[in-house]
Amino acid sequence: LFLGITFNYGLILGWTSVTNQINVIPILLYVGAIFWTLGYDTIYGYQDIKDDEIIGLKSTSIKFKENPKTFLKVCYLIFFTILLSVGILMKLNFIYYIFLLMVILHLYNFQIKRLNIEKQLSCLNIFKSNNLLGLIIFIGLIIGKQNF
């Protein structure tokens, strides 16, 4: 949670520096990104969960190791719902929603369904895929603002 709160604060800073104002949209994006980060950081944590347990670390990977996919579904559903809300509030065009479809398909089909917390490489590959996912969201937001 702390990583998501600190890491994603740049959303609000970037938004305000470009628009010179603050409104509900960057705050929604910030909250959504926190839940996205909670998800992918939990996946990342499964790579070395045994070491974390030995040293007594308190992490979402340890807390939800018995049912990680349920936790990820909740995090990613909140993230997706916020992205959907942002699209509506910003009056983005239909192409944004096509990009959102790619986002939810990736989160569910690639990340949640394929996750095997017993295999480090599975966790690493899924974690790294979030880089591409961020690009898809960014492009969707840019194209979604265009008038066709």
Task: Describe these PLM feature segments.
Residues L1-F148:
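Multi-pass alpha-helical membrane architecture of UbiA-family
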